[in-house]
Amino acid sequence: MKVLLLAGGFGTRLSEETDIKPKPMLDIGGKPILWHIMKTYSHYGFNDFVILLGYKGYYIKEYFANYFLHQSDVTIDMSDGSMEIHNNSSEPWKVTLLDTGLDSMTGGRIKRAQDFIGDKPFMLTYGDGVSDINIEELVKFHKTHGKAMTMTSAQPDGRFGALNIDDNNKVKEFKEKPKGDGSWINAGYFVCEPKVFDYIVDGDSSVFEQEPLMNLARDSEVYTYKHHDFWMPMDTLRDKHKLNELWNSDKAPWRVWS
């Protein structure tokens, strides 16, 4: 099953960093967040990726075209241009890098990948969020309901600690960053049948999270896989610092691979 990765947005909330490189290429522990997401899928045996490029897509193309230069030590013979790779850090991945337009919206980018998917089910997620989700269990769940789409949902942590205050304004308890308001939100990590493409009808201007998803839900074609454990997007510099802190302290829950 192919995995589509949305990697073309402008990342405006991280403009301090995305003025230089696209958001999926921002580092966690010296590796792009996109690499971390792909490692999760690969751990469960899914190694055929289609990366949907847009803003600064060249940086992503260059990374994979020169993967060994980024991941390994090399010796280059300048007399003939030959290169010897040391401590080979190869991956069992097949990576298609698909230019989907600078200003295309999410639905438009997905629609442009239709010819690469054909009539088979596929997976889809955003290139800016990591999770310890069990992809194998997600796919099994999708096969149980027979509908067009499974969307993973999560309950994000609150941004701030919460106070439990009695009637006299006495603080009885402090909870450090509890779950938010209890709502389940779209966490990406979709499994889709090909009929999902039929719901994307507005070309490059189609926002996948608006009419396509709304109409799929209206037609009772969407089930959700509730993920109760770790999920975190990289939306702000604060998120980036937190993810790096987790990685550098060997406490990264999404590191399911060995």
Go through each PLM region and give its residues:
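N-terminal glycine-rich phosphate-binding loop and ensuing alpha1 helix
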Residues: M1-N66, L97
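Well-ordered alpha-helical segments embedded in enzymatic catalytic cores
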Residues: H36, R109-R112, P212
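Catalytic-core segments of class I nucleotidyltransferases/pyrophosphorylases
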Residues: P121-M123, V130, I135-K143, Q155-G158, ...
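A structural signal for short hydrophobic beta-strand segments in well-ordered beta-sheet cores
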Residues: M25, A162-I165, L213, T224
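Structural beta-sheet core signal
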Residues: V3-L5, I51, L124, M149-T152, ...
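Conserved beta-loop-beta/alpha segment of the NTase-like Rossmann-fold superfamily
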Residues: I60-D166
